[in-house]
């Protein structure tokens, strides 16, 4: 029984295997049929595409051939037309050449006729000249010279008459225009008249204050005069102290310092130094403000800070009794008006006029007119001013040659401002120049820190560097300065030379 079961199972397996093999072969046959069908279809598609491509190519070639044939026909037609036009042009040119040849022949014939006529005229002219020479007794060249000389003489005479007349008219017109411009300019400005004095007075609450100003053994007044460089004159004038100083800045410094000390009531050397320091700062602020104010009033832009400060210092300066800053401002206004009348650049002229006396605002420059122009020009050049402005500053006293019309206008404006009645006083300026010269002589020696000409120029008080100048050198320095003053200056009486050498040692107890 088991054998039969196993035999049945085995037979089943074999039968299944055979069925599977048979089915597999059937599948392979179907697959081969499909592949054969696909191959045939692909070949048919490829053949169709090949035929289509060939047909398209033939069609495209046919189109291109037809297009080329049309282009060739068009080109041939163009060439034929061009040949026709060229033939027409050749025919036209031939006709023109023929016409020109005929015209040239006529011209040549006319030229020959003219040459024959000209020859005949020359022969007649030569015959006439010979007859005239025989009649007048002059050759042709002699007659030509006589005629030329006569015409030349008459031309020169007429030209000279015209030139003289033109010069006279131009001179009259120039004088009239110049007068009109100057009158118009001077009528359009309004100037302030100001005079500077070398003395100032400070009112005191009572005469006892004079003793406090002098101090014990005169230490307070010595400290004031040493720090400020001005004469403090205490005399019998009731309730007043007189300050004498040729330098307006130092005079103002002394006046304000004394007023503040009198108001405060504390007067001793330490307090004096403190007040002098504070007042110096105030005056420096005033200098800056005045410089900025005049620049703003004149609408001038781009000035260097050093130039603005120099203008501010001119507020305290005077020349021949005329305030230098007011003079510079007045000159700038006049120069601007003149520049507009003369069709020049008014901005450049106004700038140069304002800065023309800037050299007087430098501490190391003398107040005389010689030297400050060149020094001011050098300062303006170092501050970046233009060459026209620099030359106008340097040339306003003719120390150098003016190189532009603007420089001439600056000279004219300066002269107008300085020459108006009451503008200047010669005596005051000479006095200031003499005191300045005293200080300049002292500053020329090594070791001099500060120098003040006081007592109306009868004394020079000099503060020296205690490191560079010892006691022995102080004696020699005073003698050398006195000898140089004797050699270079003319003055009545005597001038006292005082050397001050001070050593300060400061230490703090903590």
Curated annotation (Swiss-Prot):
- Domain KH, by residue range, is 198-258
Query: What CDD domains does UniProt report for this protein, alphabetically?
Result: HDc (cd00077), KH-I_RNaseY (cd22431)
A GO CC term?
A: plasma membrane
Q: GO annotations under biological process?
A: mRNA catabolic process
GO terms (molecular function) for this protein are: RNA binding; RNA endonuclease activity
Q: Which Pfam families match?
A: HD, KH_1, RNase_Y_N
Membrane spanning residue stretches: 2-22
Task: Tell me which residues make up the HD domain.
Answer: 324-419
Q: What membrane topology was assigned to this protein in its record?
A: Single-pass membrane protein
Where does this protein reside within or beyond the cell? Cell membrane
What keywords tag this UniProt record?
Cell membrane, Endonuclease, Hydrolase, Membrane, Nuclease, RNA-binding, Transmembrane, Transmembrane helix
Signal peptide region: none
Q: What is its EC number?
A: 3.1.-.-
| Major location category of this protein | membrane
Per the entry, what this protein does is: Endoribonuclease that initiates mRNA decay.
- UniProt family annotation: Belongs to the RNase Y family.
Q: What is this protein called?
A: Ribonuclease Y
Organism (species): Borrelia garinii subsp. bavariensis (strain ATCC BAA-2496 / DSM 23469 / PBi) (Borreliella bavariensis)
> What is the phylogenetic placement of the source species in the record?
Bacteria, Pseudomonadati, Spirochaetota, Spirochaetia, Spirochaetales
